[in-house]
């Protein structure tokens, strides 16, 4: 599912909201998650999961084409840990 499909699904299930309103809401939610992570905050959506930022140390990597050693700088990467409800839902038979 892509963002536009999510917006359409929410709009279909909430006829009192226009698609433009739903799009603004969805974009605001994503933007707030991104801003919180940029500040280093953790974002928890109970049952669904939690977004956080992890630091990766600098390291020596390899260019897959040439095999040459390449310095990879330290960086921050987003991390998502699934919530119990999501895990249970995915593993029901």
From Swiss-Prot:
SUPFAM superfamilies, sorted: IHF-like DNA-binding proteins
Any one of the GO BP annotations: regulation of translation
GO cellular component: chromosome; cytosol
Keyword Transcription regulation found: yes
UniProt xrefs under SMART domains: BHL (SM00411)
UniProt KW keywords: DNA recombination, DNA-binding, Transcription, Transcription regulation, Translation regulation
Oligomeric form and interacting partners: Heterodimer of an alpha and a beta chain.
Stated family: Belongs to the bacterial histone-like protein family.
Name of the protein in question: Integration host factor subunit beta
Gene: ihfB
């Amino acid at each position: 599912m892509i963002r536009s499909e999510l917006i359409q699904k929410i709009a279909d299930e909430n006829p009192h909201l226009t698609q433009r309103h739903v799009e603004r809401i969805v974009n605001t939610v994503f933007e707030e998650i991104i801003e919180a992570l940029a500040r280093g905050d953790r974002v928890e959506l109970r049952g669904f999961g939690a977004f956080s930022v992890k630091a990766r140390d600098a390291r020596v990597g390899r260019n897959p084409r040439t095999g040459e050693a390449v310095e990879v700088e330290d960086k921050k990467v987003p991390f998502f840990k699934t919530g119990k409800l999501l895990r249970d839902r995915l593993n029901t038979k």
